[in-house]
């Protein structure tokens, strides 16, 4: 999933094992999660029993909500979703969303309500018009909002980031409110809850934040709000702590799998980032029923990391081509094609895919066939990039993205997530749609590729790497690397607009399909914005501690 592979001499003997790379720092976590000990069964049972009582109490509150009290209803739904509780109330929330969308009888002069309603509906797949904000524009080009009405200002800023191309009113809302919020932040107490909200939004608008991480960060802020619902607050804390127990057990399982993979395959040159990869994938599939998706995703990401490091830095051209030939056979008899150092890994990879089939059972094991197809396509594209490299070919930006938007692993990741979902709405048609690499997933792949390349290119330019999208853009337009990176950041911003437009146009697919792609985009943005946190993972340490180490005090 990094940039196309560096050139390696083809004269190395097949039996030579690549040496460990000094480029990548060792794991920051060691055996930490391998030694995890869960609470006793009675303790966990008590937590689950209390959570169930609270869930039903909150359900009654939600069922009692109507559009007659629109501000309260909108705020309640936003709060539940932001606290990571929306999954439990999908039916009730869907019913209310339809009523909110259909009911135009509300105070259109209330900027906070208009902003929150717009944000809520667009976030949940309703294509509401942005012209509701036109009445708030001033002759000076700003937006009418009293200086003391800071909450409305923040709501408008966050709502505007659910924008589509050509929505000038939202462009103007972002530029206008950003300046006012930056000024406001300088006058707030730094540790106040509202200052933290403003600061977080200026760094990452609410729509783009990783859901489970946002829940962890928002719970202590919600606790300070005078209008908080005590049952909602207690449930949010308990729910997060229960999820954390599941996450730690999954991390223990994935860490053991990874350690066995590296020990038996003897591939010591690969990046040891299984904890960070689990954190990354967790951000896309954090709801309680998606445990198997998280495990499959993490293992697939681990396998891709190994294959990528083989192709990217350590394998000869001949070795990589042999691996590609064996890969598509999915059979132990193909190991005779491989150099010695790849053979054990190949067998372990086959065993891993068999474990996926076993975990899915007879009714859903067919999903692994689609996952294999996605992985075959990934390796096929890796070989195309090798040919470009060996021929010293620099593609145009458009030509590069036709390959690299897919070779970044977009299809492999989405198919991995869908494979592990218990939801029976995920069908063969869902996988066939995904494997056709439709424009929505292609846009997501371009987003991941560009985000990766902007942060990895400067690090990789000192090595013998094939041109990234940054280099392609530099050559095509005759500009510097810094200027190319700035332009690509604009393209990344456009990708958010593209994905929103394309998601709103999707028909006939389970709603989890676009939701998953957006969650992948959020967690990828968190990994690559301003740094390559997978390679230099110190940047993730505090976030990993928050999600997997530190429970929320009850």
From Swiss-Prot:
Mg(2+) 1 binds at residues 308, 312. One of its GO terms (molecular function) is magnesium ion binding. One of its GO terms (cellular component) is cytoplasm. Mg(2+) 3 binds at residues 452, 456, 460. A motif (DDXXD motif) lies at residues 308-312. PANTHER family: INACTIVE SESQUITHUJENE SYNTHASE, OS04G0344100 PROTEIN-RELATED. Belongs to the terpene synthase family. Monomer. This is Inactive sesquithujene synthase. It comes from Zea mays (Maize). The gene is TPS5.
